[in-house]
Amino acid sequence: MFHHADKGGKKSAFGHPVCGQIILSIILLRPPLLVTAFPVNTVEEQICKDPGFPEHGIRTPSIGKFFENSVARFSCADGFSLKGPAKIICTRFYNGSLGWKPSLKPVCLSEDCLPPFIEDADVTNRTYRPGDSLIISCHEGFQIRYPDTETMESVCQADGTWDNQPTCQGCLRPLIPPHSYMNISETKFSVPVGTVVHYQCFPGYKLEGPELLECMYNLIWSDTPPRCLDVEACSLPPMIEHGDYTCHPHPCDRYIHGTVVEYYCYPGYSLANDYKYITCQYGQWFPQMQLYCVKDETTWPGFQDSLLTTWKVVACTATSVLLALLLVITAKMFHYKCKSQQSPSDEPDESRDPNILVVDGVAVPLPSYEEAISGNYCQPPNDLPPDGLESAQHSEEQNPPSYPGHTGSQNSVPLDTGDVENCDSLSDTSECLQGLQPSSSHPGGLNMSEKTNAITSMEETASTSPSIDIADEIPLVEDGEEDC
């Protein structure tokens, strides 16, 4: 129950004016209002965390709490330099929390460079000031290597670090193939020059490649590492029916890498394929093909057709050759037969001459076609002495021949020999023939009866047909009639 003051300004029972009590009563009785504001922070949220002290450094203030806008300053002891901000401020962020700005924590670094640790090397000096160069010596068999090959120097920096810090290297530790081991510890990153590595394989494996490797002066190995292969890398080779196989190298107790197997067949059988070898390569037989033996008399499909085709070709070739030979033989026989019919062997030599015509055993010389149509001609037989023959040829060149039925030439001149003379008329034919015949003392000459018969025959012919040219009655034997 509230007590109100009177008009005289009396106080209430609480010792306050009555109007104040009325205002307080109104505030307590009115409904609450909606107000937007920052959340109320706790005590821990109203201060920044302690930034701490840098090693070999000092902080100001060294104690106390850091409220908003508080400042902390840092410095380093002698011989050390500050790295980072020299002061930081406690700042409120957008989310209402407090924190240091800048947030990087400063540190104090030694102004001298500490000697670095380099494996397989000895560092000469223990204290290095900024700008000093590092002096080291590598162990025997190792060589110094710099990251920057152009500088070839390591310098102490102002922050106490080393620039272009070198290393001492040898040959890098070689790889260990599977199923093998070597005489180098696994903890060694590199080995000195001249080191020899000995590789060995576990039981059941065979070494393929060099057994020893040496580290060369140029920091590379003398050869590539070997590998260990399974001694029985390949399974049993496939068997074939009616055959067997043999190994190279012999005997076939293990089928290691590189083993060659040669197949063969039992007597009476042969391999169907020409290739009969397989090789063990990395645990597999190569080439992978099916081999089998077949009987020798077995013929493959198409073999009979090819055989018939071969016989056909051979038969056709033989028939063609025989026909050609038969034609050649027939032509030769026909040619010989024609020659034998034209000039039999028992005929005198005079009949074989195409310019001689034998009439009742008398050889009569025949003129050529040009001589027959040009004039009269009379020539002694071929068995006259050479002198008479030359005179007859001389007479033939000077005077054209005359035949019965034609007027004798006015320019005919008797030959010097007297053996051959021109026949100007039919009445002189007998005398001309008598002059042409050789004497009875000449071998092979004709007797008087034969001469008389020849003269009589020619006179009868001339008297019967005085106007007929002898060249028209006597057939000319041309060169074309020799061939059949």
Curated annotation (Swiss-Prot):
Locations listed in the record: Membrane
Region (Disordered): 374-484
Biased composition (Acidic residues): 470-484
InterPro entries: SUSD4, Sushi/SCR/CCP_sf, Sushi_SCR_CCP_dom
Disulfide bond residue pairs: C48-C90, C76-C108, C113-C156, C138-C168, C171-C215, C201-C228, C234-C280, C265-C293
Major localization listed first in the record, in broad terms: membrane
Gene Ontology cellular-component annotations: membrane
Keywords, sorted A to Z: Disulfide bond, Glycoprotein, Membrane, Repeat, Signal, Sushi, Transmembrane, Transmembrane helix
Domain called Sushi: residue spans: 46-110, 111-168, 169-230, 232-295
Keyword Lipid biosynthesis attached: no
Gene Ontology biological-process annotations: chordate embryonic development; regulation of complement activation
Leader sequence residues: 1-35
Topology term for the membrane: Single-pass type I membrane protein
PROSITE patterns: SUSHI
Residues bearing carbohydrate: N95, N125, N183
Transmembrane segments: 311-331
Disruption outcome: Morpholino knockdown of the protein causes defects in development, abnormal locomotion and increased mortality. At 3 days postfertilization morphants have abnormally (delayed) developed eyes.
PANTHER family given in the database record: SUSHI DOMAIN-CONTAINING PROTEIN 4
Protein name: Sushi domain-containing protein 4
